Design a protein with these regions (language model features):
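Residue(s) in the substrate-gating loop at a strand-loop-helix junction
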Residues: 126
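Canonical Rossmann dinucleotide-binding motif of NAD(H)/NADP(H)-dependent dehydrogenases/reductases
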Residues: 1-17
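Alpha-helical segment proximal to the catalytic Tyr-Lys
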Residues: 111, 157-161
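The beta1-alpha1 cofactor-binding region of Rossmann-like NAD(H)/NADP(H)-dependent oxidoreductases
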Residues: 23-24, 44-56, 88
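Substrate-binding pocket helix/loop in short-chain dehydrogenase/reductase
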Residues: 81-83, 87-95
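A glycine-rich helix->loop->beta "capping" turn
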Residues: 36-39, 59-70, 79, 90, ...
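Active-site helix of classical SDR
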Residues: 106, 144, 152
């Protein structure tokens, strides 16, 4: 989903910034875009670290001047773990990436969009926000994506009058 989105945005003329927990993967994705004559940059980013989000945001602003569109696509799923057997670390890891990471990015990039007079944020949720994909026992994933959808609605309501649109997409289970 992430690379296809980056590719579509770059084909529409956007300068694309690719972030990934795996710095090499971000560079490889950027090189694929550059091979098609597109421009952009790649950055290592752990979305679970709010200070890292702030540092990367600062680097992007210094390099590109502004951010008009943010797509929050980082996410993980750990399936087939019954809720009654799920350890705390699994629950927290999924919520940290899927929900906290989205919030840290929305807060940081959203603030600069508010200051510059507008922007658009797209959060990648899931159909699992609204239905349970049983037999995939993944209470933590479903809860995290439902929270992303509600966070999106909350931010959309808060920021709409200040010209920052916040929406979510809900892809099928991949």
């Amino acid at each position: 989903i992430g690379f296809a989105t980056a590719e579509a945005l770059s084909e529409a003329g956007a300068t694309v910034v690719i972030t990934d927990m795996d710095a090499h993967a971000a560079e490889v994705a950027l090189e694929k875009l550059r091979a098609k004559g597109r421009s952009g940059s790649a950055h290592h980013l752990d979305v679970t670290d709010p200070r890292a989000v702030e540092r990367v945001h600062s680097d992007i602003i210094n390099q590109h001047g502004r951010v008009d569109v943010l797509v929050n696509n980082a996410g993980i799923a750990i399936s087939f773990v019954p809720a009654e057997k799920m350890d705390d670390a699994t629950w927290l890891k999924v919520l940290d990436v899927n929900l906290n990471g989205v919030f840290w990015c929305c807060r940081t990039f959203g603030q600069s969009m508010l200051e510059q007079g507008g922007g658009a944020i797209v959060n990648v949720g899931s159909m699992s926000a609204d239905i349970v994909n049983y037999p995939q026992e993944q209470a933590q994933y479903n809860a995290s994506k439902a929270a992303v959808h509600h966070l999106t609605r909350s931010l959309a309501a808060e920021w709409a009058e200040r010209n920052v649109r916040v929406n979510a997409v809900a892809p099928t289970y991949i």
